[in-house]
Structures are given as structure tokens and as C-alpha cells.
């Protein structure tokens, strides 16, 4: 009887999305001596790749809209319609993602979430009753001001002028007026799939540098976030200062909670619940997952850690295929995985490794299949 393997990979950031990673592993296993029965269950945590994972595993339709990128340029962004068009799935990175900018353009003072707000509006035009927003992979630290502006919120400075885009808007924000927000939001449920648990205050220090913020700018944005949370508390009667997950995507999660009454959820758990992961796991003998770079963050609730925990609860073995392992690797730190295999064939540069991720995954899965096919004497 064929071994039943559940393939639940995470994306290799900047190299290979989770859907293609799953297909590469399947190819390798099926060409091996093992000849297993494979079920593909790619995972995401709310960040880059969430949309493709949802579309690949549900009855869905991909829709496009012309919106603004983080710097206000026109970009064609995709979103999905699932559940017979009743629910829209928006990946924030499609409109406001770091991947849309070259390194020299990363400047949180100017980058805005306005385009994501336009995607929300486009989804409302489709008549949906629920919108799921995956908020990872953003280029922004604007506290979600751009989204609120795109949806009709009036955010002004001390002179009554609209605040500028980006974190520059946070620096002069004085008044919040929600009276002109799109009225359709009142009957639409908003769910935010978060990839981190960080709070609003403290988020700039953690995520600002990767989005182009200098240490001085990080400290400045932290002060603005604190003042912003005080404004929200006085205007909207909601405390977002230390709201769990509120710091996701530079404060977008906190804004959607405060202005749109959104529910903030663990992105991985939400996606797996929607795509039937538990049922697939119940029918499997073994789980294979992946991670680009294995490190301590892998164990902080990220997708691979979550699926590994679920598998171990059922007493099923877990194999992890990784792009790299840390120099200070210790098996004691990764006890949820029965075996960890680096996929690199030889010492190579990061750019070369990223170029051949699919090939490396397929080859490693092929050898893994041959290993699993060896019969005990």
C-alpha cells in the first residue's frame, strides 16, 4: 500500500511560491522508488503568496484592478473571489508590497497603503459580504492611513489639510473623521490574516529597517505610532497601542481593527481552516514542509512550525526541507521535526540557490523518496 504523504510547503521568499514548491516536491517523490500517494497543501501566513495558495485550493476566480503601488504609480493588482463570490481575498503585497520596489525606492516616509484601500473598494464593487486581507510583505509603515484615505476617511493636519501619504502623514496627523467612509463597509465583515503578533507600538523597530527606515526614522515613527494610538483612542474609543497583531504590515492591522471593526487572526490558522488541511492530515502518514532559511523565527508560530505541531499531535512524522540551516543549529531547538534536509547540492551563492530552488527541491525529494523506500531487513 502506498505511503500517503501530505506536502505542505511554505514559500521560498523571492524565489519560489508555495504552490510551485509543492509541485516540485511531488515531482521528485513520484519519480522515486517510493511511488507514494501525494496530497498537496501549500501554506501561507498572510504574507506573500497567500492569494495564490487560496486560489489553488478553493473554488475561486481571480480578478484584477488598476490601483496605486506604494509610491502612487499605477499597477495591475490581483485579488480573489471565493465562496461563490461572497468573499474577497486580498493580498496586501499585490498593491503595497515590498516586491514592487527596487531597494533604492524603499522609503517608509513616502510609501503608502492607498492601493490596498483601492483593492478593498474594488472588492466592495463586486458585492462581497466578507473581505479577507492578508497583510504580510508590505513596503509600508503608515499605520494603514492610506487604506483609510482610499475608503473615504478624512485624515487632516492641524490646519485641516489632508495629510500626505506614508509615514509623513503620521507625523502631522491631527484629526480623524470617519463620517465619509464607504457605507458598504458597515455590512461587510473584514478579517485580517496576520503573519506576526507584534503590537503597533514597537512594530517600527522590528520591521522598519527591512522597509528602508534608518535607526533615526524608526525612533521617529515609534513616536508617531504612540501619538496615533492616542488619537484613535480619543476619536474612535478604541485602544490599539498594544493590540496583539496590531503592528502587522506597519500598523495596517491596527487601523483595520480601529476604523473598520476588523477581526485580527493568525494567518496560517485561518488559511488552513479554509483549505481543508486537517482533513488532509487525517488521511496522511507523513508530513513534508519547507522553509527558506531555518532560524529561531521558524519556531515563533510561522506556517511550517504550525503544521508540524498539528502533525505531531497525531503522532505523525514530519520532514523539513530547507534552503539553509543556521551555523549554531542544534536539534534540541527543532524537536517538532523528525528530520531536516538542506536542499543545496553544493556550496553556492544565495542568488544561485534562489535561481535553482525548484530543481533543488525536486532532486532532494527524489532522494528522500528513495531513502523512504528502503525496506528493513
Predicted regions and their residues:
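N-terminal loops that bind phosphate or other acidic moieties
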Residues: 2-135, 139-377
Amino acid at each position: 500500500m502506498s505511503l500517503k504523504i501530505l506536502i505542505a510547503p511554505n514559500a521560498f521568499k523571492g524565489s519560489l511560491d508555495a504552490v510551485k514548491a509543492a509541485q516540485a516536491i511531488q515531482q521528485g517523490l513520484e519519480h522515486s522508488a517510493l511511488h507514494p500517494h501525494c496530497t498537496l497543501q501549500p501554506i501561507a501566513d498572510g504574507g506573500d503568496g497567500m492569494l495564490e495558495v487560496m486560489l489553488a485550493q478553493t473554488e475561486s476566480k481571480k480578478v484584477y484592478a488598476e490601483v496605486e503601488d506604494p509610491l502612487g504609480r499605477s499597477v495591475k493588482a490581483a485579488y480573489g473571489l471565493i465562496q461563490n463570490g461572497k468573499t474577497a481575498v486580498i493580498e496586501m503585497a499585490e498593491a503595497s508590497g515590498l516586491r514592487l520596489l527596487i531597494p533604492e525606492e524603499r522609503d517608509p516616509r513616502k510609501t503608502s497603503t492607498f492601493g490596498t484601500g483601492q483593492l478593498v473598494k474594488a472588492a466592495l464593487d463586486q458585492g462581497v459580504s466578507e473581505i479577507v486581507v492578508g497583510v504580510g510583505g508590505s513596503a509600508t509603515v503608515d499605520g494603514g492611513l492610506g487604506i483609510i484615505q482610499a475608503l473615504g476617511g478624512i485624515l487632516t493636519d492641524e490646519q485641516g489639510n489632508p495629510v500626505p501619504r506614508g509615514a509623513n502623514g503620521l507625523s502631522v496627523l491631527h484629526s480623524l473623521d470617519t463620517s465619509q467612509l464607504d457605507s458598504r463597509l458597515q455590512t461587510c465583515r473584514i478579517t485580517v490574516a496576520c503573519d506576526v503578533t507584534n503590537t503597533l507600538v514597537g512594530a517600527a523597530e522590528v520591521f522598519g529597517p527591512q522597509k528602508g527606515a534608518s535607526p533615526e526614522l524608526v525612533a521617529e515613527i515609534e513616536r508617531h505610532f504612540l501619538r496615533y494610538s492616542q488619537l484613535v483612542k480619543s476619536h474612535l474609543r478604541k485602544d490599539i497601542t498594544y493590540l496583539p497583531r496590531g503592528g502587522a504590515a506597519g500598523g495596517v492591522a491596527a487601523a483595520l481593527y480601529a476604523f473598520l471593526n476588523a477581526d485580527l487572526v493568525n494567518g496560517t490558522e485561518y488559511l488552513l481552516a479554509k483549505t481543508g488541511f486537517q482533513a488532509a492530515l487525517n488521511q496522511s502518514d507523513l508530513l513534508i514542509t519547507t522553509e527558506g532559511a531555518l532560524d529561531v523565527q521558524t519556531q515563533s508560530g510561522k506556517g511550517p512550525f504550525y503544521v508540524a505541531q498539528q502533525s505531531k499531535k497525531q503522532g505523525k512524522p514530519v520532514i523539513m526541507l530547507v534552503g539553509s540551516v543556521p551555523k549554531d543549529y542544534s536539534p534540541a531547538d527543532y524537536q517538532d521535526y523528525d528530520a531536516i534536509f538542506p536542499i543545496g547540492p553544493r556550496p553556492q551563492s544565495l542568488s544561485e540557490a534562489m535561481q535553482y530552488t525548484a530543481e533543488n527541491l525536486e532532486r532532494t525529494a527524489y532522494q528522500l523518496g528513495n531513502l523512504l523506500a528502503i525496506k528493513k531487513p
